[in-house]
Amino acid sequence: HAMSRRQRQMCIRDRYKVLSPFSEVKETLNKLKKKDFKLAILSNGTPSLLGNLVKNNNLENIFDDIFSIEEVGIFKPDSKVYELPVNKYNIKKDEILFLSANTWDVSGGGNYGFNSVWVNRNKNIFDNLDYQPLDEIHDLSELLEII
């Protein structure tokens, strides 16, 4: 049986509801939290999707904030999205260490002024973009070695 476009979209949406973090993520985030880092999510996802992912993975006490593109009505890598945490916390752009597995997002955050780190789990080659990451890690635990 062929699935309709709507059925495929619902199937994909349902899969996003049950995403689990990689094995080292929770422990690493807890260690960062104990070192008094403010931790936030900055995503193209919707607030309800992101909130459910955080709740379903028992990460509610780890993240200080969840920023969604819905707050500004435009997708990353538009600079309005990257402004969200800067404006909320009244901090300088270069005070933020921004991590992403997406090269376009690393580049967008870096061009905005963040210190961007590429989470390159598959040891890919960074896309030929106009920004090179501050650093590259292969899993989140490596972040503890560079901060």
Task: Name each region found by the language model.
Residues 2-4, 26, 33, 90:
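Short, flexible hinge/linker loops that cap or flank conserved catalytic cores
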Residues 1-12:
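Single conserved hydrophobic/aromatic residue that forms the stacking wall/gate
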Residues 13-41, 51, 79:
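Short, acidic loop-to-helix structural element flanking the phosphoryl-transfer center
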Residues 11, 34, 145-147:
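Short, Lys/Arg-enriched, disordered terminal segments
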Residues 30, 42, 46-47, 51-147:
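Asp-based, Mg2+/Mn2+-dependent phosphohydrolase catalytic module
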